[in-house]
Amino acid sequence: MRGKIYGAGYEIFIIAFFIGLYFDRTKPLVDDKSKRKRFGHQLMYWGNIEQRGGRHPYGRLREYIFAALIARTDIDLIALDKGDITARSVVDALMDKMEQYANFGFDFMQEKLEEDPNYFFKETAFLRVFTSFLNENKEETDEDDDVPESLD
């Protein structure tokens, strides 16, 4: 994927992450670390721009990413508190989960581009991707509503 199509590299990473998160799908990175790409822009600086050109900083988004990673990563916080595991190992687990969600999201986007090279040039492309999660959740909820609640 060419990042310039989408804007700053970290912005497309955020989108890819949320695609993986909402599909609840991960894809491991390649084992050969020399083939991995780096953005070179630390997470703590993502979205830290001054308002210009109608853009606003989105620091809260980083907080939501962190909260989602804490919720979806298998971490024993009690063991961390007791010192049985290191903070470094927890950070590594969170980073690995974030990268795997994003990796799935990048694959998802690549498939869409292979089907239609102009897919993401449509104004509503990402809106359609993310609203598709709402439709899936509604269908699951509707199916659950058909079954009466147990009186036991």
Give the role of each language-model region:
Residues 1-3, 44:
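Short amphipathic alpha-helical segments and their helix-coil junctions
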Residues 5-31:
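Short, basic amphipathic alpha-helical segments that act as recognition/interaction helices
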Residues 26-152:
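Charged, low-complexity intrinsically disordered terminal regions and linker tails
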